[in-house]
A protein has these predicted regions:
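Preference for long, well-ordered alpha-helical segments
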Residues: 118, 125, 140-199, 206
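Short, hydrophobic/aliphatic alpha-helical segments
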Residues: 3-21
Length: 206
């Protein structure tokens, strides 16, 4: 079931239940889509204004990219649920079954893929929001700051859905490769999100 077709209230109700999905990954994707949309809104409030005519084409291009990012992020909500299914089934295999370790290992790697992709999309979103914050309408700059803060939270949340799985991998080389990629994104784009927030906030105290 694609929870993105449900109401906000329905999504939250199911999220709070004992259903296996949506979980942290799906919630991260939805939150990232919301943060991206806030940045995109800044673009929508910039286009068509004479004051920003010199950056209009750049803003339009960013809006188109964000439209795509929003759609991709929403697609990750059901994708994350689907990615968890093999892992749930693997845990159900009797511990004395000789096939269990290999099946569990493969399922664990599969379960990492969607949250890692969510992180990658969050990074792309933050790059866009940085430009919206710097060049978009000053009347909506707070929304760019909000978007950056929200997408950062989604980035961090998605990373935990990777780390909980890499911790259990027997192939430590694969685990460390995934961890390094995620930690790199957290470091670089966590700092970018903080810079956006700090710059936007500072502008209100000048």
């Amino acid at each position: 079931m694609d929870m993105t077709t449900k109401s906000c209230r329905e999504f939250v109700t199911v999220l709070a239940s004992n259903e296996p999905a949506p979980g942290g990954g799906g919630a991260s994707a939805l939150v990232a889509a919301l943060g991206t949309a806030l940045g995109n809104m800044v673009g929508a409030l910039t286009v068509g204004k004479k004051k920003y005519a010199d950056v209009e084409e750049e803003i339009k291009a960013l809006m188109k990219k964000c439209d795509d990012l929003q759609a991709q992020l929403l697609d990750q909500v059901p994708a994350d649920a689907e990615g968890f299914v093999p892992l749930a089934k693997a845990y159900g295999i009797p511990k004395d079954d000789p096939s269990r370790p290999e099946i569990l290992e493969k399922a664990t790697i599969t379960a990492c893929q969607v949250p890692m992709h969510i992180m990658e999309l969050c990074c792309e979103s933050l790059d866009c929001i940085a430009t919206f914050a710097a060049k978009g309408s000053r009347l909506a700059v707070s929304d760019a700051g909000c978007g950056a803060t929200i997408v950062k939270a989604a980035l961090q949340a998605a990373s935990l859905n990777v780390f909980i799985n890499t911790k259990t991998l027997q192939n430590r080389a694969v685990a460390e490769e995934m961890n390094a990629k995620c930690l790199g994104m957290l470091d670089k784009y966590g700092k970018l999100a903080d810079e956006i927030f700090d710059t936007v906030k500072a502008g209100f105290f000048k």
